[in-house]
Amino acid sequence: MEPAADSSSSLQTFQTEVTEDSFGKFILTCNIARIRGEPSNVYTGLNIGCRLPECPPENPFEIYYLMKDSELQENNDWIRLYLELAVATTDRNREASDFGLSNLEIVNVAVDAEGLLNAKNAIFYIRYKDLYEARLGNAVFDRIAIVRRIFDEDTGRFTLVGQNQSSDIIN
């Protein structure tokens, strides 16, 4: 944290929280940090817009914007975070040591949003290979993580909602 321009001011402590709204479902919310002690008028109930995204009837990788390799490299940190959160929060049957999150290989990403990658509200279709599952001999290792990103400027609430599905749903 950088000190304020006025050298007489002290450092401020900010507070925020990230919550998992439902065990085993990828519904994570984070309220924007505010100075500790300031009143909060943030709505705490589950927003109707937070329903789990579903795969459209058409192949999302053919109808929505397909990220270029250079865009994937440039935005890999947060795309990868979305993918890892989707896998870790929806597959609770794996032991923590078995998650193999490093064994998730992103194949391609489609974006459904106005403003594309910089949109505050968007749905990301992340096709990936679960190389951990492939090594176990499981047939379903080509998967899709569907992640909805929602940012409400009025409340300062940031929400990620998502799920994993077999890529067979689009073939």
Curated annotation (Swiss-Prot):
Q: Which Pfam families match?
A: protein_MS5
Residues spanning the membrane = none
Task: Name the protein family.
Answer: Belongs to the UPF0725 (EMB2204) family.
Q: What's the protein name?
A: UPF0725 protein At3g25080
